[in-house]
Amino acid sequence: MKRFWLVLLSLGLIVAFSASAMAVDVKFSGEYYAAGMYLDRTNVNKTSYTIPATLTTPAKLVDEGPSTAFYFQRLRLNTDFVVSPGLTLTARADVMERSWGANRTAPGTAPDTMSAGTRSENENIAFDLLYVTYVSPIGMFKAGYQIDDVWGLVFGNSSNPKGKIGYFLKTGGLTLGIQMGKDKELSRSVNNPNGDTDKDQSFYTAFGVYSWKTGEAGLLFKYIKNNQNRNAFGSLLGPLAQDAGFTWDGLVTTPYVKAKLGPVALEAQIYYLYGKMSWEGNTAGIPAPALAAAGLKSTQDVDLNQLTAYIDAVVDLGMFYVGGTLAYISGDDPDTLDEQEGGVLGGGLDWNPCLIMFNNDLTYWAGRQGGYNGSSNGGVMTNAYFG
């Protein structure tokens, strides 16, 4: 009889913990935009020019490019399933993000820009966010696919959906938080049967924000463990470069401040990356052309030392505003083989300071604009002064 009651109690616990939770409230919100774009030319060449012939390629005429004009749209739908007053499931989807009447993108596997879905999925419907929020007496917990790479000001931000878990505590004007998550997973799994051990990229974040009546200031530390390139050359070159590849560890430190000083609105932020890229395996078997093709200088360990800075000020003079912006992003010195001063940090995809250069909207909808001798305009600001 005792065994019967024990089995019955066990079955009851299993049912209790596996029961579905019904939402007591569902909230919808979202945004829709439709826009048009016109370019008088689809590259940044002022005049046509000729690329001289080489021993292997004929001469090529590069003109200014044709003009283009088109319309595009996107519906972004946010849904909150409120299970209880302290428990919420949040989902976000982008619907029909496409140019009107344009060809559809072929199905693929690579995620779209700032999306958890592919470009072809975004042209139909792609879910980017899905996470649960639990507000407890000791703080708030979040787990699932959430927005990451966003901190402080718009400078340096790229709103990327990533799987992560976080804890947040607010006391007075101070908010503290810790997070951990995954940028990339290349370890062996059902979708990657040829993956290697511990071949992924993870991050661990701790931050604090203090707010007052006329502003706020914050400080964030983000440790990144990047093992994506472990055995990268060994898997391509075989025994010649057995297990050859590299990993890198980096710590990003970024303080920011926003303040209103009378008629002056001031904001500033700094990003500093410090770390090391370490080689492993039989690096002597990697030929120089293979290194060059991967954009690498050598097989010696490299120190990461990169800096970006941003300051913006606006003065309210009543009838009009006066202001200015300054930004700096360090670039890599090709003569320092043991140090990388640029290439990781950038201005971010959320920061679009110009209509043509460093404008993610232009790049996403019109593509990269070709320049002189194979160069092109597109992507985030890197290796630059801006003002």
Where are the regions that the model predicts?
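Internal, well-ordered domain-core segments that constitute the primary functional module
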Residues: 140-220, 224-231
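Positively charged n-region of N-terminal signal peptides that target proteins for export
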Residues: 1-4
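Conserved, mostly hydrophobic/aromatic
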Residues: 324
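Beta-barrel outer-membrane channel/assembly domains of diderm bacteria
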Residues: 6-145, 165-172, 211-213, 224, ...
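Outer-membrane beta-barrel proteins
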Residues: 39-43, 100-104, 150-155, 176, ...
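Charge-patterned, long linear interaction tracts outside catalytic cores
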Residues: 223, 227-245, 250
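A surface-exposed, glycine/aromatic-enriched loop/edge motif typical of exported proteins
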Residues: 332-362
